[in-house]
């Protein structure tokens, strides 16, 4: 038996093992997306809001919970780092799930940047009662929103069928309600609180749906495994 033929079974098994390992890692990274969305809701409207007597979820901004001087800020500062790590992992999972699809690769890069930008947002929080903190906070928020919109647009471009339309509708809902909430600021009022939460919720849910869509998406076999299969 030629040496090359004797090596093929071993090489094939090694390629298959790497493929399984990479697939497992990819799914773990993708799972970080839905986990980050769930933790966001629990940490903000759950833990942080419960520490602020008189805080009205239906009328006040989520940003106020992160603000310097907020009773819930001590909960949300460590959460911000956890959320950042989870979302960056999710962005990497998207990137690793879409070989050969340029639009979805760009989306993965933008989602990773979105996650990292939470660090900048943490550096420029609102300060309760201090209007001078507002401009830089708005600038940091708008840059992150641009990353979010870009990612959703590229996902819509990279998919066909239901996921494309779901991404478009989610983007429209998030953007429209975000603009409505912005116009209702500084509040408090029902339009501000509910509108902002619909805007945020549309994005958080979209992240979970995207993770499921990519979880089900089969990856192309590695080049080495394809060569082994063609040699059989």
In which residue ranges do the predicted regions lie?
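Hydrophobic cores of alpha-helical transmembrane segments in multi-pass inner/ER membrane proteins
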Residues: 2, 79-90, 143-155, 202-215
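N-terminal signal-anchor transmembrane alpha helix
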Residues: 24-50
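Interfacial segments of alpha-helical transmembrane regions
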Residues: 26-35, 99-112, 163-170
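C-terminal ends of transmembrane alpha-helices
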Residues: 42-53, 57, 116-130, 174-192
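Interfacial helix-start motif at the membrane-water boundary
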Residues: 64-85
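Internal transmembrane alpha-helix with an interfacial aromatic "cap," most often the third helix
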Residues: 81-109, 152-159
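Membrane-proximal helix-loop-helix units in multi-pass membrane proteins
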Residues: 116-157
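Terminal transmembrane helical module of multi-pass membrane proteins
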Residues: 156-232
């Amino acid at each position: 038996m030629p040496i090359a033929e004797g090596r093929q079974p071993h090489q094939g098994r090694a390629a298959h093992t790497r493929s399984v390992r990479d697939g497992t890692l990819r799914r773990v990274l993708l799972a970080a997306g839905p986990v980050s969305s769930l933790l966001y809701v629990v940490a903000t409207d759950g833990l942080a809001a419960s520490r602020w007597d008189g805080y009205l979820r239906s009328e006040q901004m989520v940003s106020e919970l992160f603000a310097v001087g907020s009773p819930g800020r001590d909960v949300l500062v460590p959460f911000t780092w956890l959320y950042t790590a989870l979302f960056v992992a999710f962005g990497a999972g998207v990137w690793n799930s879409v070989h050969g699809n340029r639009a979805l690769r760009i989306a993965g890069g933008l989602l990773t940047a979105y996650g990292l930008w939470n660090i900048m947002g943490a550096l420029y929080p609102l300060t309760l009662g201090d209007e001078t903190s507002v401009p830089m906070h708005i600038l940091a928020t708008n840059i992150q929103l641009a990353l979010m919109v870009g990612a959703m647009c590229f996902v819509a471009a990279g998919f066909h069928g239901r996921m494309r339309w779901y991404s478009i509708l989610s983007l429209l809902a998030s953007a429209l309600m975000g603009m409505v909430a912005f116009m209702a600021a500084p509040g408090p009022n029902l339009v501000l609180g509910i509108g902002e939460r619909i805007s945020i919720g549309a994005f958080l849910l979209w992240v979970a749906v995207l993770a499921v869509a990519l979880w089900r998406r089969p990856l192309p076999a590695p080049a080495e495994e394809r060569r082994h299969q063609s040699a059989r």
